[in-house]
C-alpha cells in the first residue's frame, strides 16, 4: 500500500520445516480468520525450503500461500510450483517473500540479491504471461526469473494461475490475489552461493534420492 520494504529474521520459523511450513505459519499468525482474500489485509507468501538451490532432487519447488479465492470458507491454501523462481529467491538470500496491502496502480517487485524495488508495471498490465515475461526479461535482464500473472489474474478470476519461468504454473487462485494487489510480477535474480552445514550428508541424500527416483520408474 505504501510501497515500503522491510526485512524480518526467519529464526522464529525454524520449527516449521520448509517453504510450506514458513508460508502457512506466516498466514496463520498474520492474517485473521474471515479476511476477504481480495482485500489489502490478505497476504501472499512465496517461500522456499532449506534444501532449495542445493542440488538435492525435488527440492526446487516453491510454496505460494494465501487465502482461497475459490471456496466460500476462504481458508489458507498453498500452491506449489517448479521452475527457477525458488532457486532465484534462495540465491538472492531470502527464505520467504511476504506481500501485503494493495497498490493503486500496476507494479512489479524486483529483487536483485539484497536490492528490492517496487517498480511501475503499466507497460505490461493487460498482457499475457509470456509477453510479460519477455518484456520484463528484456528490461531487467534475461538472468532474472519472472513470475507473473496474466489478464485472468488481473480480472480476479478465482482459479487464475501464476506462471514462472515461462511455463511453470501455480494455481489455488494465487494470481487473483496478486491481481487484487495490482502486483503484475515478481522479477528475481540471485547470485549468492548456498552453503550447507554438512555437504557430504547433502551429497549422500542426493544420491539416495536419485537411486529411489530411478528405481521407482524401472518397470
Where are these regions (language model features)?
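Intrinsically disordered, low-complexity segments enriched in small residues
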Residues: 1-80, 84-219
Amino acid at each position: 500500500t505504501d510501497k515500503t520494504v522491510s526485512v524480518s529474521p526467519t529464526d522464529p520459523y525454524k520449527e516449521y520445516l520448509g517453504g510450506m511450513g514458513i508460508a502457512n505459519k506466516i498466514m496463520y499468525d498474520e492474517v485473521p480468520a474471515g479476511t476477504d482474500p481480495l482485500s489489502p489485509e490478505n497476504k501472499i507468501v512465496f517461500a522456499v525450503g532449506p534444501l532449495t538451490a542445493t542440488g538435492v532432487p525435488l527440492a526446487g519447488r516453491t510454496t505460494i500461500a494465501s487465502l482461497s479465492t475459490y471456496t466460500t470458507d476462504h481458508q489458507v491454501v498453498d500452491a506449489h510450483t517448479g521452475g527457477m523462481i525458488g532457486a532465484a529467491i534462495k540465491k538472492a538470500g531470502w527464505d520467504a517473500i511476504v506481500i501485503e496491502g494493495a497498490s493503486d496502480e500496476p507494479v512489479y517487485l524486483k529483487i536483485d540479491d539484497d536490492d528490492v524495488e517496487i517498480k511501475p508495471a503499466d507497460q505490461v498490465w493487460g498482457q499475457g504471461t509470456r509477453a510479460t515475461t519477455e518484456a520484463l526479461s528484456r528490461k531487467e535482464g534475461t538472468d532474472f526469473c519472472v513470475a507473473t500473472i496474466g489478464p485472468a489474474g488481473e480480472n480476479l478470476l478465482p482459479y487464475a494461475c501464476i506462471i514462472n519461468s515461462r511455463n511453470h504454473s501455480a494455481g489455488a487462485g494465487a494470481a487473483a490475489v496478486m491481481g487484487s494487489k495490482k502486483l503484475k510480477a515478481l522479477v528475481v535474480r540471485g547470485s549468492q552461493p548456498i552453503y550447507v552445514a554438512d555437504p557430504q550428508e547433502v551429497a549422500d541424500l542426493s544420491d539416495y534420492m536419485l537411486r529411489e527416483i530411478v528405481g521407482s520408474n524401472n518397470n
